[in-house]
Swiss-Prot record:
This is Large ribosomal subunit protein uL14. NCBIfam families: rplN_bact (TIGR01067). The keyword Lipoprotein does not apply. Binds to 23S rRNA. Forms part of two intersubunit bridges in the 70S ribosome. One of its GO terms (cellular component) is cytosolic large ribosomal subunit. Belongs to the universal ribosomal protein uL14 family. It comes from Corynebacterium glutamicum (strain ATCC 13032 / DSM 20300 / JCM 1318 / BCRC 11384 / CCUG 27702 / LMG 3730 / NBRC 12168 / NCIMB 10025 / NRRL B-2784 / 534). Keywords: Ribonucleoprotein, Ribosomal protein, RNA-binding, rRNA-binding. Gene3D superfamilies: Ribosomal protein L14 (2.40.150.20). InterPro entries: Ribosomal_uL14, Ribosomal_uL14_bac-type, Ribosomal_uL14_CS, Ribosomal_uL14_sf. Part of the 50S ribosomal subunit. Forms a cluster with proteins L3 and L19. In the 70S ribosome, L14 and L19 interact and together make contacts with the 16S rRNA in bridges B5 and B8.
Length: 122
C-alpha cells in the first residue's frame, strides 16, 4: 500500500537507492498503489556515477510491498520492504539488473522484462 510521501527502496542498478512517491498514476482520485502499479517519484538518495541523479523525477513500478496482497487462490503475499523498479515511458526498466524477488502479479500486468531480469519470482 503505497501513497504520496511513501519512501521506497530501488531494486535495480540505475544508481538510485531510495525514491519518494509523489503521485499514484491511474485517475485523479486514486490514493493507493500496490504491486504492479506505476507511480511518479523523485530520487531522494543516489549513488555517485549512476544513471539517475538525486532530485530527478522518474516513473517506477512497485515490485514489493509490506502490505499483504490477496491472490485469486485465497493466499496472501507480503515482503519485508517496499521496493520499486525505475522504468522508462514505454514501461521498460531503465536498469539492466533487478535485485531481490518480485511478485508474480507483475507478469499479469505485462512487465515481462522485469520478470525475466528478476532472480526470483514469488
Amino acid at each position: 500500500m503505497i501513497q504520496q510521501e511513501s519512501r521506497l527502496k530501488v531494486a535495480d542498478n540505475t544508481g538510485a537507492r531510495e525514491i519518494l512517491c509523489i503521485r499514484v498514476l491511474g485517475g485523479s482520485t486514486r490514493r493507493f498503489a500496490g504491486i504492479g502499479d506505476v507511480i511518479v517519484a523523485t530520487v531522494k538518495e543516489a549513488t555517485p556515477g549512476g544513471n539517475v541523479k538525486s532530485g530527478e523525477i522518474v516513473k517506477a513500478v512497485i515490485v514489493r510491498t509490506k502490505k499483504e496482497t490477496r491472490r485469486a487462490d485465497g493466499s496472501y503475499i507480503s515482503f519485508d520492504e517496499n521496493a520499486a523498479v525505475i522504468i522508462k515511458n514505454d514501461n521498460e526498466p531503465r536498469g539492466t539488473r533487478i535485485f531481490g524477488p518480485v511478485a508474480r502479479e507483475l507478469r499479469e500486468k505485462k512487465f515481462m522484462k522485469i520478470v525475466s531480469l528478476a532472480p526470483e519470482v514469488i
